[in-house]
Amino acid sequence: MAALMNGFGSLQCKATVHVEKGHMQASGMAFFSPVNRCAQVHISSIPHFIGAKSVSASQLRMRHKVGSIRASAASCLQDETTKYFDFVVIGSGVAGLRYALEVSKYGSVAIITKAEPHESNTNYAQGGVSAVLCPSDSVESHMQDTIVAGAYLCDEETVRVVCTEGPERVKELIAMGASFDHGEDGRLHLAREGGHSHNRIVHSADMTGREIERALLQAVDNDDNISLFGHHFAIDLLTCQSNGEIYCYGVDSLDAETQKAIRFISKVTLLASGGVGHIYPSTTNPPVATGDGIAMSHRAQAVISNMEFVQFHPTALSDEGLPIKPATRRENAFLITEAVRGDGGILYNQSMERFMTSYDDRAELAPRDVVARSIDDQLKKRGEKYVLLDISHKPREKVLAHFPNIAAECLRHGLDITQQPIPVVPAAHYMCGGVRAGLQGETNVKGLYVAGEVACTGLHGANRLASNSLLEALVFARRAVQPSIDHMVDADVDPSFAKKWARPVLSVSLRDSILSDIIEKTKQARMELQSIMWEYVGIVRSTNRLKHAEWKISDLESEWEEFLFRRGWKPTMVGVETCEMRNLFCCAKLVVKSALARHESRGLHFTEDFPYLEESKRKPTVIFPTHIQELTWSSKPLQKQLQCK
């Protein structure tokens, strides 16, 4: 159950997080514990997003130099199933890599990623990085665009920090070898996208994320103090309690290649694991985006915020409208970047009637939430499956130069974008909510920092402005460095810590036939969950549909859980497919609970029962962990917490 509360809890939420003293947990590491925890939902009663102390740019500079440490004493004490590092980074997108490259100057670093290192949301980002780099532009203008797009729910201090520090972070990327497009005058070519009042998007054709990922991975590869662990699935954070505070000391993981459980003990953990796109059937996110970081953090007693604000990108490629259909169903939808509309692309229905001018004065350059709802309305009214995005009126050379990846993908399926409109449809794209973070990426769990899509910093408010995601990741990855170093210096991690948490049990002990049945059942449950989310928790919502989704998700999860038990699944077992399913259930429930708590329509959350924006409700949604309640195992820890010794 979730209760709607009044009042505000600080970032530390000492009075709101209830943990049984005298215990330590691998926070929810395995599934079916006798202990249940649930979320308490409240709409924060003060407009400022984070109850954390502001830190100026000058304060952010290194207050003391620890010195270059090739490997700490603890990091040398490795064995086959336990590894010790000063810093553990979960995720290999722009946020995780950029952070790792900074903290590696002060200690040993492990980067854990669940697939190949390049397989992140960053790698699929087409548009670019927004930054004020033109004399005619200003930080104030970028701030205003961000706040308007965010439906005035953005935290103004966070917005100012990001818009002010962004240009320097972009320059650092260039210095590290990232190559961006330049104009004929030799200066950076700055594109314009929906919601922006100026040209301020730094880009590398329509493959910006890929170029940034390439440059950062190359730098990581050249850094001897960073160890990268691919195909390591993060299971749960290792946490304990001391003096009313919760501390994080690393993470348990599953090496998918060796099928061994690997424990990473660390002084500092940065969570940069990306979003939750795969709670929906169609998403631009890669298959790794299953909400692992948010779900782990929720089980670890971290505060979660603004989960109702799921951004649907207005223009994903519609395979239904292609002349040559793909041979197999895509794992993730192919994104048609915002920059196509920014470059003059026009949206039509299938009767070639331009429709955006009927919905918003900004037409195709309106923010994403407006465009996605407009397309959704057209599709429902006309009974069609896609609309058309036309850029063919622009010079062929310009189109091919700016959008080579899109042009090539469409041509593979028989469509020439220089002559024909592109069939597009909205798809789940970005989670504006996540783990609640302060101005330095800090969470209410000591030693746990967050950056990138997994975090909710207050920048995006109720809707993210185009190309602000990579920007936010860069800024907060850098801002988390100094407090991480300070915590690392002060932290006392005894090697014996590794023995304090129970180890997960691998599912390989089950017979192959049983495992096959479980994996097949899990695939079915995943598809059913995605269908429920799209039908009842999509672009347009209602209270009845949200409540319907709530009980359908609960029933589906219980049915799946019971099937696993009948087939011999044990309470402490882990497997990649089942852990992902667990996290998907958890995140889906958080989205629904948050959506039910917001009794207005704002930004990405539009509900027919409360169709108007209300000033009195201009507050973030905050989910606090609270007393034991009756929930399924998505929120259950394996064991009670131990007192930190």
Swiss-Prot record:
A biological process from GO: NAD biosynthetic process
Residues the entry annotates as binding FAD: 92-95, 114, 121-128, 292, 453, 469-470
Segment annotated as transit peptide: 1-70
Disulfide bonds: none
CC per GO annotation: chloroplast
EC primary class: oxidoreductase
Enzyme Commission number(s) from the entry: 1.4.3.16
Cofactor(s), names only, from the UniProt record: FAD
Coiled-coil intervals, chain numbering: none
Coarse class of the protein's main subcellular location: plastid
Catalysed reaction equations from the record: L-aspartate + O2 = iminosuccinate + H2O2
Keywords of this entry: Chloroplast, FAD, Flavoprotein, Nucleotide-binding, Oxidoreductase, Plastid, Pyridine nucleotide biosynthesis, Transit peptide
Name of the protein in its database record: L-aspartate oxidase, chloroplastic
Organism per entry: Oryza sativa subsp. japonica
